[in-house]
Amino acid sequence: MLRRFAGLLAGLLLACTASAGAAGFAPHTTAMHTVTRMYVFGDSYSDIGEGYRDGNGPTSVAYLAQRLGFELMPANDPAAHGKSLDYAISGAKTGSGTGHKFGSALLGYGMRNQVDDFAAQVRSHQITFDPNTTLFFFAGGLNDGNLSTDETVANLEGEIRTVYSLGGLHFMVALLPTGIPDFSAVATRLDPALAHIPAELNSQLPGAKVNISHWGPFYDEVLHNPAKYGITDTQTQCAGRAIFHQDATPCTSPETHFYYHHGHPSTATHKIVGGMLYDEVKALEKQGML
């Protein structure tokens, strides 16, 4: 099934390489070692339990980690020491935000705060990592509707700079899905600016390899071509959210629904996208760009 996506993926990577050259820097020539550790910062589309899992199972980054051969765990999991960690929090903007509690769930804890938590753990030696085999994945902006494009870009670039100052070298910055109605406007506005982040940072951070991930377009691919991936319903949610006192009774076939909650993909969709992310990472490694 994912083989059918190979042509599109190759085209996206070719476009990424071409835009890199046009921006005034050469594609990377030294491939990173195989990814053995990953740290994720983002919002509900990546949250696997740090704040609130807005769906019925793992998100795409967790499936990416699984395909890479390791487990991704919520950063607040007591058993997470020495593991790949997911700091993503549902409702997060790319900037700062202390968040708010809904019962046991935490919503809106900003990506700046997530990165600061990671930085504090590195500085206190609770976290150590090998820069040559560690990937830092940033997927944010869906909740930045009231921030300017410049603010979003500055937030993400500042967070990448912080991680770079701690020794990070390998980064992916996600483009956003433009086909999902709830987020179409902000994604369409932000994506052209997000696409320029690698060119800017690679020229300023010696040794860093910052790449775009077509994470958002991968969701769009599934949404626009559902039959290829075994998805039959791209319109209706499978269940409501219990934390908002909605009927959380699941539909009879969540594995065929693009959405599980309103505006948020099912874990079946996330698994498909996770496979695409894996192909993307491996293609970038092979090209020496990651």
What are these language model-derived features?
Residues M1-L9:
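Bacterial N-terminal signal peptides that target proteins for export
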Residues A22-L290:
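Conserved active-site regions of diverse hydrolases
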Residues L9-T17:
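Bacterial N-terminal signal peptides
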Residues M1-L2, T17-S19:
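Short hydrophobic/aromatic-rich beta-strand motifs
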